[in-house]
A protein has these predicted regions:
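Acidic/His-enriched low-complexity segments
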Residues: 1-245, 270, 275, 375-378, ...
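Hydrophobic alpha-helical and helix-loop surface patches within well-folded domains
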Residues: 175, 207-410
């Protein structure tokens, strides 16, 4: 497969100001994105854009000509454009689809009434389906996000709400500015939700959200687990959780187990909610390890991010290991490492015995190859086990010192 050009080498955003209006019933959205960044070539600026209709584009306040490249690229042309700092403004629109990536609806019923929640899934390269951007992990920037939605619903983003107002019969929600982050970690959820909230001893507000189709008691275990996991990782890593809040949202429709969007983690309902009336120990263990895995990603992947997808193991292998470290500390009576040895380790050994199996670190030349490297037996289980061996060889104190240095330097 032909390698694609890495656009972050041509133009590097430093800040996005993104404003999107969601039309849930019409299954469309429109928006304007202002991108500040540094151009490293002359004559053109290339952005990722897929399935979007581009209405206009300005570079430094002057109209730019538009063209499209086959590789999800929007090309902005302007006579006399030279390398250096520039401000781009792009007006666009797109569709809300049932693909469970980009911007998509989740369906549920309450007392026989059909309802929907709108959510996003941008990993690995689906942010480009929601707004023009440099949709590569190393192109980290800050984001200001404003969403215009229908009234009388909950609207969540990566950061706490900075302001919210009603305007022309709609709800306008503006979020606080994010730290520098990759486009695949941007997220929002909009719909009728219930929540339960607690605060860590360091003042991080933790909330678990679900639709009203779920019983309120099913949120309790997740909330307790999330609070204690954040407190554990703060101590273990020696680097505090970087955001003021941590939202955990159970979605009725979700393509994976969970997604570590910074400050707004989304889950399949079974991976977050535990009904105390009917649950089993294995269900609690599954939810606990998924929550710990995603919270570990708030450091591994979100705070420190791989430059490109060939180093996905830096995200997933560490998170796989740390989910067990955390849950073993919180629930030593579960003997969770025995489950790891009997399940994931055996899976890794079986997968690794096959001819042609991928390595933990695998070259990726095209976005279409990314999904194939999310191999649970290799990048997750084998990589996690190797790191567990490294921890045992180094000793836990030195291992933790190394992690603190890793987070601090990168």
């Amino acid at each position: 497969m032909k390698s694609v050009t890495r656009l972050a080498n041509l133009f590097r955003p430093t800040h996005y100001d993104l404003s999107i209006t969601l039309h849930r019933e019409a299954r469309t959205f429109e928006g304007v994105v202002t991108i500040q960044g540094e151009l490293f070539v002359d004559d053109e600026i290339r952005l990722h854009s897929k399935g979007l209709t581009i209405h206009s584009a300005l570079i430094d306040g002057k109209e730019a000509a538009l063209s499209h490249d086959p590789h999800d690229e929007l090309v902005l042309l302007q006579q006399g454009l030279i390398r250096g700092s520039h401000v781009i403004v792009v007006s666009f629109s797109g569709g809300i689809t049932d693909t469970m990536n980009g911007v998509y609806p989740c369906y549920f019923e309450v007392n026989g009434e059909k309802k929907e929640v709108l959510a996003t899934q941008f990993e690995s390269h689906y942010a480009r389906q929601a707004f023009p951007c440099i949709d590569e992990p190393e192109a980290k920037a800050t984001f200001d996000v404003t969403l215009t939605t229908e009234k009388n619903i909950t609207v969540l983003g990566n950061m706490p709400i900075a302001s919210q107002r009603e305007e022309n019969g709609a709800l306008v929600t503006t979020f606080e500015t994010t730290p520098i982050m990759s486009s695949y970690l941007v997220a929002w959820v909009a719909g009728e939700l219930q929540k339960k909230t607690a605060t860590t001893k360091d003042g991080v507000e933790v909330s678990v959200w679900a639709t009203h189709a779920q019983t309120p008691g099913s949120l309790d275990f997740a909330l307790d687990t999330a609070v204690h996991c954040i407190e554990f990782f703060n101590d273990y890593f020696g680097v505090p959780y970087p955001l003021p809040k941590s939202d955990h949202v159970a979605l009725p429709d979700f393509s994976a187990g969970a997604m570590e969007n910074w400050g707004l983690i989304t889950y399949r309902e079974i991976a977050l909610l535990v009904d105390p009336e009917v649950t089993t120990l294995s269900a609690k263990q599954y939810a606990a390890t998924v929550i710990a895995h995603e919270l570990s990603h708030q450091w591994f992947g979100n705070l420190v991010t791989m430059k490109w997808w060939n180093d996905l193991w830096l995200n997933e292998s560490f998170a796989n290991m740390m989910e067990y470290v955390a849950i073993d500390a919180l629930h030593p009576d579960w003997n969770i490492w025995l489950d790891h040895a009997a399940g994931e380790v055996i899976s890794a050994l079986r997968r690794d015995s096959l001819d042609g199996v991928q390595a933990i670190q695998t070259d990726v030349h095209h976005p279409d190859q990314i999904s194939s490297i999310f191999d649970p037996s290799i990048v997750y289980a084998k990589g996690g086990r190797l790191l567990r061996m490294l921890q045992a060889y180094m000793g836990d104190d030195d291992f933790r010192t190394g992690l603190t240095s890793y987070f601090t330097k990168h």
